[in-house]
């Protein structure tokens, strides 16, 4: 949830490239970034020419349509409000990249976690930068086993939860 800058999609594509795994990446974003902001991002510089091509392809992919970035990586970008969106299908991994509960409380309600749990496969993984108690409790309530992992610079911890 939250396509944002496309960083999670980009890193997933880079990491999966050459693995032989088929990735169907779906992202929901209410406010897509302006193309000028996307062009100013330096993410492609971290990965060479191939990475730059992938990054551009991710951002140039149409909205509301499944699009093959590579033979093994397809992307579906959905322009929608997660609070109104009813996902279909089942997901192995969910990057929950919303702003924290203090800034976007509507994204952290029990109903959102009920929806997440209903579309996550058994042993599916949910990750988020928020490590607040209410987030952990909602994940546990909806059938996840929660672990706290060391966070990136400036963030003490983040959550990795596995659906039981």
Feature locations, PLM:
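SAM cofactor-binding core of SAM-dependent methyltransferases
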Residues: 1-59
């Amino acid at each position: 949830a939250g396509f944002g800058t496309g960083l999670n999609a980009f890193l997933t594509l880079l990491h999966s490239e050459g693995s032989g795994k088929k990735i169907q990446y779906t992202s929901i974003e209410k406010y897509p970034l302006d193309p000028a902001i996307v062009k100013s991002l330096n993410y492609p510089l971290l990965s060479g020419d191939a990475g730059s091509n992938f990054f551009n392809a991710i951002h140039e992919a149409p909205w509301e349509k499944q699009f093959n970035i590579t033979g093994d990586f397809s992307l579906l970008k959905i322009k929608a409000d997660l609070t109104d969106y009813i996902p279909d299908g089942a997901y192995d991994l969910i990057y929950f990249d919303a702003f924290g509960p203090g800034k976007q409380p509507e994204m952290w309600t029990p109903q959102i976690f009920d929806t997440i749990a209903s579309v996550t496969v058994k042993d599916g993984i949910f990750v988020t930068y928020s490590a607040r108690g209410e987030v952990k409790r909602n994940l546990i309530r909806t059938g996840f086993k929660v672990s706290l992992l060391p966070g990136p610079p400036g963030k003490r911890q983040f959550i990795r939860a596995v659906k039981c």
